[in-house]
Amino acid sequence: MSIDIDWERATSGPDGELLAERIRSFIHDKFQQMVLPRFIRSVQVTSFNFGTIPPELEIRDLTDPFPDFYEDGDEDLSVSSEEQSPMREQADRYRERIDSWQTNSPGGLEVQMSGRMGFGHPLQLAPDEDGSRLHPLRSPINLGDINPYLFPRSGTPGIPGGTSNLGYFMPLSGLSGSQTPLRAVTRGNPFSGGWPDSPLENESRMGHGQGPPRRRSEVNVDAIQSRPSTVNTGNTLFSRGSVSTGDPRHSHSSQTVLANNPGQAPEANDSPVSAVPPLSGTPPRRMREQKAEDFQVFCRTKYAGNISLSLTAEILLDYPMPSFVGLPLKLNITGLTFDAVAVLAYIRRRIHFCFLSPEDAYALIGPETGGGGGDTMEPNSLRRKNLSLLRKIRVESEIGRKENGKQALKNVGKVEKFVLEQVRRIFEEEFVYPSFWTFLV
């Protein structure tokens, strides 16, 4: 199904001029960021115009949007509250409470834990509306309590624990049961305690054989088996300045101190591993909820118009010495031709727009739109030819100032080739999937 576009109405008027200025500014910024050849200096994009010839559009398919379009980025934090999920709102409340507590509490974190709270009481915050609580920070691992048979190292005078390549925050709760010192487990010795001066370490040493039963800070190594724990490096409320969007009530780790009752012992079947979510090297992506009214359109786009782009630069001559003289350059792109598949997705007041590469278009739409000009092409031929979405770009260049109505130089191929390569690169990096543009409507 073909679509007719009122090109003049869409590209003229105040809105059209504003859009053209934004595109000009965007291309200008991209040229400022790229590395220029030695003989070109100070590239400036002076004007951009949509032209008078509209593109030809043909709808090919209607599907569900790509999953990447549902990703909730940092730029979406200003969206109205009705679009935010309850989990995200709860995470934002936790972040605000943490920032408020750090701002209003005098002294550092150690003063809060040891001076005001005392050694016998874990750090507690007021429960939220749903009854969930924030977890206290844990002390670093005492490397001196490591079994020497597991990590052999030579002792060094003056350095407690010897010289080991073991990381400072490397967790020890994931050691297998076959390598665990059983006497330490049966006697209730905390295998992964904190530093000697930490409140949790002092409390665990004072409580042997005289007081409360074992708390969650004392890890059951046999229950974990050989799976290493990553709680020290991953799922913390202060990591990377952001809060995980998972439900805080289900984010308890094996080293979490009981905040409800410090003297209450965990149940026998309380497995710390079952509550630890799988962690990866990158934080999980926040995704919006999919709705039935979301849709995506695949549209074949053909364009052979008179779009124009003007650039100015300076060419340096190295004779008789480097950068001896600079000649002004004016370069005009007077039109281009391309044939591609455009993707237009509508998701709750947002429009996501991008183009597909020839290989992706062949896989999703078919061989009819895989190559330019409607030719049927196989994927191997597409990779071999390395086709670009921009088929032809018409360029006119003028070098030097006019003297007696004549130009000093015209249509210098080396300069034109560089500019065309950069225009193609900017277009493919910014407009071809997985890159896409989002517009609020």
UniProtKB/Swiss-Prot annotation:
InterPro entries referenced in this protein's UniProt entry, alphabetically: Mdm12 (IPR027532), SMP_LBD (IPR031468)
Coiled-coil region(s): none
Ranges that cross the membrane: none
Annotated region (Disordered), positions in chain: 70-89, 180-289
Taxonomic source organism: Paracoccidioides brasiliensis (strain Pb03)
Protein name, UniProt field: Mitochondrial distribution and morphology protein 12
Location relative to the cell: Mitochondrion outer membrane; Endoplasmic reticulum membrane
Role summary: Component of the ERMES/MDM complex, which serves as a molecular tether to connect the endoplasmic reticulum (ER) and mitochondria. Components of this complex are involved in the control of mitochondrial shape and protein biogenesis, and function in nonvesicular lipid trafficking between the ER and mitochondria. MDM12 is required for the interaction of the ER-resident membrane protein MMM1 and the outer mitochondrial membrane-resident beta-barrel protein MDM10.
Subunit structure as annotated in this protein's UniProt entry: Component of the ER-mitochondria encounter structure (ERMES) or MDM complex, composed of MMM1, MDM10, MDM12 and MDM34. A MMM1 homodimer associates with one molecule of MDM12 on each side in a pairwise head-to-tail manner, and the SMP-LTD domains of MMM1 and MDM12 generate a continuous hydrophobic tunnel for phospholipid trafficking.
Free-text note regarding domains: The SMP-LTD domain is a barrel-like domain that can bind various types of glycerophospholipids in its interior and mediate their transfer between two adjacent bilayers.
Organism phylogeny: Eukaryota, Fungi, Dikarya, Ascomycota, Pezizomycotina
Polar residues: compositionally biased ranges: 226-245, 253-263
MF (Gene Ontology): lipid binding
Gene: MDM12
GO cellular component: endoplasmic reticulum membrane; ERMES complex
Keyword Calcium set for record: no
Domain (SMP-LTD) ranges: 1-441
Disulfide bonds, paired cysteine numbers: none
Alphabetical keyword list: Endoplasmic reticulum, Lipid transport, Lipid-binding, Membrane, Mitochondrion, Mitochondrion outer membrane, Transport
Membrane topology label: Peripheral membrane protein
Annotated GO biological process: mitochondrial genome maintenance; mitochondrion-endoplasmic reticulum membrane tethering; phospholipid transport; protein insertion into mitochondrial outer membrane
Family stated for the protein in its record: Belongs to the MDM12 family.
Main location (coarse class): mitochondrion
